[in-house]
Each structure stands twice: as C-alpha cells, then as structure tokens.
C-alpha cells in the first residue's frame, strides 16, 4: 500500500514538472521556436483546432517563424488567430506561407518575463510540496488504521522527501535554463 502511495506521488510530481515546463514554454524569448505557437487555436469548420493540426510551423531564422498552412483557404483565419493571440506577433502572409518576425525583447521586458518565469517555477514547487503533503497524510492514515508501523511511516516520509527534492531540483534546472535563454541578446 505504501508503495502505491509513493508511485502515485512520483507520477503526480512528474506531471507537476511537465506542467511547469509547458507553462514556461509559453513565455516568449527573443529566439524563434515553433512551440511558441502551440497554444494558438484556429477556427476550422466551426470548431477551434490547434494550429499544428492545420499548418506546419518551422524556423525561418533566429527571429522568424514560418507557418505553412495545409489548406490555402485557411491562411486568413490562421493569420487572424496569430494576431489575436496574446503573444504580440504580427504575421505577414506571402502566398501559401505566413512569416512571423519576432521583435527583439527590451531589457525591461526581459526582466518582466523573468518574474513571470520565476512565478511559474514557484507554482510548480508549491504543487510538488502539495503532492508530498498528500502522500505523507495518506501514509499516516494507514498508520492510524494499523496497516503499517511507525518505522514504515518514517521510511516512507524520507522516500517522499527525496522524490520532492529531486523534482524541485528539476524545476530549478528548468528555471535556470529559461532565465539564461531570456537574458541572451
């Protein structure tokens, strides 16, 4: 039973790290990256469809993304969806492709983005600590029901703490990489 609690905690902590990675990927750096447009939804035959299902996104150069729309009739809709996103991008269509130049980030904007990234990292750490709390309380419940000993509880808490430390370290590494990426000119 304790092993199930630990494996559940491991799975939930992994999800927290992945969620944090996803949230940080949404923060735009000065460099072009196709994942920047992953959150954009395009109206397609009456329903919202992810951009990557109606077009392919590639890197033109360090500051330009190129979007190749599969259906030429969708070019205007894709362009409008990119413009209306909160990324502050201005797409330019050139035939069947859409070029998206990424403006350079100012020093002030970089600092604001670093604050956002740090907040996301802290949210990830909090989520991991909540998973730790849940796992430890579940183990203590088992002890109250006399399904495990006090030594088992201590051992389990130590194991869960090691998991917590490892996952928080992962988030810190992701944060450091993102901060470094943001501060590059």
From Swiss-Prot:
Coiled coil: none
Function: Responsible for the release of ribosomes from messenger RNA at the termination of protein biosynthesis. May increase the efficiency of translation by recycling ribosomes from one round of translation to another.
Example GO molecular function: ribosomal large subunit binding
Keywords: Cytoplasm, Protein biosynthesis
Species whose genome carries this gene: Shewanella pealeana (strain ATCC 700345 / ANG-SQ1)
One of the protein's GO biological processes: cytoplasmic translational termination
UniProt-recorded name of the protein: Ribosome-recycling factor
Lineage: Bacteria, Pseudomonadati, Pseudomonadota, Gammaproteobacteria, Alteromonadales
Family from the record: Belongs to the RRF family.
Keyword Ligase: no
GO cellular component: cytosol
Originating gene: frr
Cell compartment(s), UniProt: Cytoplasm
InterPro entries reported in the protein's UniProt record: Ribosome_recyc_fac, Ribosome_recyc_fac_dom, RRF_sf
């Amino acid at each position: 039973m304790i092993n199930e609690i630990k494996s559940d905690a491991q799975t939930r902590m992994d999800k927290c790290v992945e969620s944090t990675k996803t949230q940080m990927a949404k923060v735009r750096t000065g460099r072009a990256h196709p994942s920047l447009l992953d959150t954009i939804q395009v109206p397609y035959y009456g329903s919202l469809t992810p951009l990557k299902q109606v077009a392919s996104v590639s890197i033109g150069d360090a500051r330009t993304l190129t979007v190749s729309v599969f259906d030429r009739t969708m070019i205007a809709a894709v362009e409008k969806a990119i413009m209306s996103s909160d990324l502050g991008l201005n797409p330019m269509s050139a035939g069947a492709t859409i070029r998206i130049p990424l403006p350079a980030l100012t020093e002030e904007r970089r600092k604001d983005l670093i604050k956002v990234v740090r907040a996301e990292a802290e949210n990830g750490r909090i989520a991991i600590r909540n998973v730790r709390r849940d796992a430890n309380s579940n183990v203590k419940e088992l002890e109250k029901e006399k399904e495990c000993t006090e030594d088992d509880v201590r051992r389990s808490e130590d194991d869960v703490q090691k998991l917590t430390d490892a996952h928080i370290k992962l988030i810190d590494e992701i944060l450091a990489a993102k901060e470094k990426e943001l501060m590059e000119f």
